Amino acid sequence: MRDLDLSYNRIGDAGAAALAETVAANAHVESLNLRGNDVGPEGCAKIADVLARATRVISVSPPHGETDDRKENDEPANAVSPSRAGTGLRFLDLAHNPLTDDGGAALADALRLNATLTHLDLERTSLGLRALSALCGAVNESNDTLEYLSLENPFQFSVADEHAWPAARMLGANVCLKTFKCGKWGLKHEALETIVAYGLCENKTLETLDMRCNRVDELGGAHVARALRENKTLRRLNLEENKLGDAGAVAVAEALGETTCLMQLDLRCNGIRERGLVALADGVRAMLENDAPPSELRLWGNDFGPPGSKAATAWRDVFKRADSLGVTVKADITFRVVDGQVHVARMTEIGTKEVGNRF
């Protein structure tokens, strides 16, 4: 058995401790899903202890002048590999459990030693500033295996946005992380500036950044634009339910034609109206003409205006242009012409199912 899915089973600390020992004793278990249970800091500490046992074994070269008796197929000197005594756990989902700061800190300590885990989901686990800083610090300073980290919806964050600094340092230094989720962190445009300047502009590996449901306003658009221009690996950016408005959207739009890697962009519910939506349509058109088209766009929840508006017509024409180029761009909006006017409708299953017309 490689995958253990025990999500939503009312498992508490005692059950988590027993499962931790089971995982420790069975090196074949690679995935443990405990989402939506009642695991607290004590149970989390047991799981962290098991993760910490899967440390790195560093082979030391023989002293100068001595011979190396390793055979041809043995690992080279100074090789680094997971300890055979530890777990082989690669995927851990503890989302929606009351881990608190103590549980998060225990996991941070484990990440400094662990050599197997690639996916860690800690969404809505009652983490506070101490745990957020500890986890980002561990990934920044001591971990080079983790590829996916979700710290969405913490219990506590700072009004002054100082929790953005550990995240920025982590992104700027880490060379393995591909997905980072920091939705519902209460981040404003000052925090985004920090994350972009000290994190994304230095990062060479991140492919997905999820910052949904934060407080990034119109001033944040310039920082998003800088990230799109300077980062060369970011493929998916989620800014759903922020406050970019028209000015922020225009800044983002101006950078779209300069990015060569962005594939998915989510700007739903950002208070964008006609001016911003028309600018974004022009930006996506530039991506098409530069042979760097997006694969997925989400825009519903912004104000396209009445039927026949410039925004509705501009976006209809952009998708027509994509079709003429043989490019498939999935979106959460579609268009119908009624009485000579372009109407915008929502797609519930993106790109497949129309469900109505708000405008």
Regions found by a protein language model. Give the residues of each.
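Leucine-rich tandem repeat or coiled-coil scaffolds
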Residues: 1-359
